[in-house]
């Protein structure tokens, strides 16, 4: 059990956050026709939305940002739909099912990055940028080098996420639907390409909104039924769970998963700053009309996500009571059928029968599609807008840029399917950890300092950004997950699971040192431009609004 918990501690914090990567052994379940029918209804409905959206996508603004006409409330729901993953739902509830109170600490830990986005990033990002966060980073710095660095940071994060998503999708669908792994991966890839290729940000937004509503409804119903079972008393919920759990009262004790304080701090920093550097999340702030709506987006999104993670805590304890103590959900060896990640799915059956089980299974699949669609659009915009239109072919027409974007969507989709098949039996949890570390070590420092530090120069941003990215990759390779578990060495060169504490420090120090020592005329000019940028970031004066965006 201790080894299982250690593995969960190493993989779930990141996998649950956004990757849908269901780690560990998966037992294929019998074909669930109710779930398949419900999922097909969702697919047909969302493809109808994609067709509707395709008729309204007439320009680059429409494709990248839905014309800037998404409201703060809608965008908040879409952000929540982009961020709340199937592994958040299944993984966190499984963590609570096995470890109790520690699951709450992890689930709430995913929210710590959102106050940073709310207070430091959202408004200025919207006022300074148009389509990608590279627009903000390059506002007063050299366009070419900064956009190349930002695009590389975005593409690496997107690529790592997509691989983890595709592998997680295949495993999850095998687990829930009883479908073949390869069929599942191809299905997700094709649907992902159709949503983004034809509907752009408008279709992606509505897929994410629908998914968020379905997931919040399903989780709310499960939590309500659990609380009804215990007379709406948390005291009864915890008492009954402690009475049937093998650990007894120990499930209410915190600190059982990450005992090393440096690892805990590094994990926390990675989650906090990584969230604020995810390209597919940052891109959503350009879909609203102004900074006020951007701020409202974060407010609503944080509320929806906070509510959802509290529900997963109730669901996890409900699973201890109604699933863990019921031999009907266990195999001959006494283990949960399908593994611990099936705890929430079994609970759906326990509280709502086969029909609700089919609904929850379909919702879990829908969450994957919503997340991969956002990732694909973020990757495509990094190539077409940042690299093609602003570096390699300046002055490209909107039509040319959109063509490159759609070609990139196809390429990303095919690559995601191929790598999803190739990585079927690999430990992909480290990819998500690495993606988070890169987002925190490369993207976040550049975004933050470009908006707030007047002495930042292109030299400092380039040196610090690349140092942060390379440090995160190297330390992850030398750490226990890759060096020992994957490459088979006896002892890790870098002793900690999570590199964020060190790679973020290297990035900020590098940016500070190389900017402070930059005495060039170009550096002086970039410092002088900060005042104009600051006024624009505060007022939004000069930024295109609404449909013009």
Curated annotation (Swiss-Prot):
Keyword Transmembrane helix appears in the UniProt entry: yes
Pfam family, one: SSF
Membrane-spanning intervals of the chain: 33-53, 77-97, 103-123, 148-168, 183-203, 206-226, 262-282, 303-323, 355-375, 404-424, 428-448, 464-484, 493-513
Subcellular location: Cell inner membrane
Organism: Escherichia coli O17:K52:H18 (strain UMN026 / ExPEC)
Topology of the protein relative to the lipid bilayer: Multi-pass membrane protein
HAMAP family cross-referenced by the UniProt entry: Acet_symport_ActP (MF_01426)
GO MF, one annotated term: glycolate transmembrane transporter activity
Protein name per the record: Cation/acetate symporter ActP
Function in brief: Transports acetate.
GO biological process, one term: plasma membrane acetate transport
Record NCBIfam families: PRK09395.1, PRK12488.1, sss, symport_actP
Family as reported in the entry's similarity comment: Belongs to the sodium:solute symporter (SSF) (TC 2.A.21) family.
Keywords attached to this entry: Cell inner membrane, Cell membrane, Ion transport, Membrane, Sodium, Sodium transport, Symport, Transmembrane, Transmembrane helix, Transport
Any one annotated GO CC term: plasma membrane
